Amino acid sequence: VPPYTRSVLPNGTVLLVMPRKDVPLIAFTALLRGGSVADPQSKPGLASITAGLLEKGAGARDAFAFADAVEGAGGSFTAAAGTEAITVSGQFLAKDQELMIGLLADALERPRFDAAEFDSLRKRRIEELKAAKDSDPSGLIRLYGRRFLFGDHPYGSPSSGSERSLAAISRDDVLGFYHANFGADRLTLIFAGDVDAAALTQAVTRAF
């Protein structure tokens, strides 16, 4: 493991910083404990929909403005739900550190969950599941292989959910999942790249 610093912010968030000065970039990953295992049994895919909406507008920025801020800086920003955690990852130029931290803090603490974006994302995810079932056989294994191994255990449900379960998910479900499962004490933030560990820690503490 490269040299790193570890600290705990006043709000309980764990912060890991790995300075690396050879390239003018900063990469980040935010890990929030509780991914699809926290989905209600009748609504697999709720964590995945919630995670997907984190990059569809936050704080003062709607989805277009959020994407424009990321792309305008030549950065990347993605969010997804795994079995045990929701992960938000990205990379920006070191000179855009303040923007990067601001976008991340907005996404995690002030997501908009706009109704139109929810409807659009849910529809797209359902269409993707339909297409996967109609594609090559590996798509079927990806969707249903875990069910054969874990049965009705939460591990047996694909993080993506099913056509039926996604259709049953409402925006209120997303809001409820967010308030029940997102919290500073469940969050680990990891930064690596062209950073000063002390300065970054101060900036993250202010933002979060």
Give, region by region, the residue ranges found by the protein language model.
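Proteolytic maturation boundary segments
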Residues: 1-19, 23-29, 190, 196-208
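Buried hydrophobic packing residues in well-ordered domains
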Residues: 12, 30, 48-50, 70, ...
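M16/insulysin-pitrilysin zinc metalloprotease superfamily fold
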Residues: 56-60, 91-123
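Acidic/histidine-enriched alpha-helical segments
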Residues: 67-72, 112-130, 142, 196
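M16/MPP (pitrilysin/insulinase) zinc-metallopeptidase core fold and M16-derived inactive scaffolds
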Residues: 27-94, 135, 157-159
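Scaffold signal of the M16-like zinc-metallopeptidase fold and its non-catalytic homologs
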Residues: 100, 132-184, 204-207
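Solvent-exposed coil/turn segments that connect beta secondary-structure elements
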Residues: 10-14, 20-22, 31-37, 54-59, ...
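Short beta-strands and strand-coil junctions in structured, solvent-facing domains, enriched
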Residues: 35-40, 110-115, 197-198
